[in-house]
């Protein structure tokens, strides 16, 4: 009998009832909520006369609709209704939360780890597709729909069919200027957006071991972009060091760590599919089309049209086969999102910005993913570096990742973005999104177009 993967071990710990291969009832350790997918679920509870079963295992924050300038000036009627609903609901149902504008407020997938609520071994859900982010800590994390949000509120459980297992091994040492965002974009570009459908993906390898926790979160965050709603990594000393002294970790931290150390994949664990990618062969990535698989290494020509999806993407993006990333005329640069708005991301970007100024006729904004990140960045002077370079320094929120708040890319404009999705109209009606790393986005803001960060000096910040 083969050994177990970390996913097997966590799954087995949380099964309440049901047979493998069929829907199984799973216990939920942590339920994160935000203002967009929770209002209908709360109303469903009221209509049924139910309460939240475990408010102590639930945590809410405001992120999707939050303005990043004049944060209390919410003019969109739907956005304001959703924000007001969450504010009422967390009080009525006695749910721990980070108030809008409070010291801990931010994007839910950043606030969870920052407060220490995200921990190895936990089974985590949220009404948001990028909940796989939390898998970087050795947790099961995945997005759920509003009906499921209500089910978790009422029962602290969820029905799930155990997925197959995909192992992705990142090996080698990256070139200067290549980051974890490039790893995941390269993987998706090579294998497509359907690679992980029906699978949980586990990431291993010396290239993963070398990453910081924040860099690991970037990879797990984008698991959903190739069809896998769950991404997971084995916890290690970096995980434990990150969590130590966080507000919500177990009081007996060392005992918790002793347990967490057992939550790693056995050497003889079975996987249904295995893929290996040598990151030493990777270059900085830039997407040209309208899904994350439509990406190329910097300097590589955009591919020929293979099908109607490609044709539609080229038409929407106003690009042509044979062009390169250098041909893109950028009007906007966005540094932010739950993929790349952590302190380490801002530090990397600042290295390519310090002492320079953004290109004429270009708008560049920096949106830290949480209030603690914003404060930490300001403490070491990153805000001044960006402001002196002509960037806008905003308050935390999901911002320009999606067109649900005032931060939108104008129609027809091309935007270099550190977010996770480049779908049609994602950043605003007619907006043209190019996904890339914080380094590539920062350098592009200065040049007004994409340039090869491998050839650029890095300032000391």
Curated annotation (Swiss-Prot):
GO terms for biological process: L-leucine biosynthetic process. It catalyses: (2R,3S)-3-isopropylmalate = (2S)-2-isopropylmalate. Pathway: Amino-acid biosynthesis; L-leucine biosynthesis; L-leucine from 3-methyl-2-oxobutanoate: step 2/4. Its cofactor is [4Fe-4S] cluster. Keywords: 4Fe-4S, Amino-acid biosynthesis, Branched-chain amino acid biosynthesis, Iron, Iron-sulfur, Leucine biosynthesis, Lyase, Metal-binding. Its EC number is 4.2.1.33. It is an enzyme of class 4 (lyase). Binds 1 [4Fe-4S] cluster per subunit. NCBIfam families: leuC, PRK05478.1, PRK12466.1. Belongs to the aconitase/IPM isomerase family. LeuC type 1 subfamily. Catalyzes the isomerization between 2-isopropylmalate and 3-isopropylmalate, via the formation of 2-isopropylmaleate. Heterodimer of LeuC and LeuD. This is 3-isopropylmalate dehydratase large subunit. It comes from Streptococcus mutans serotype c (strain ATCC 700610 / UA159).
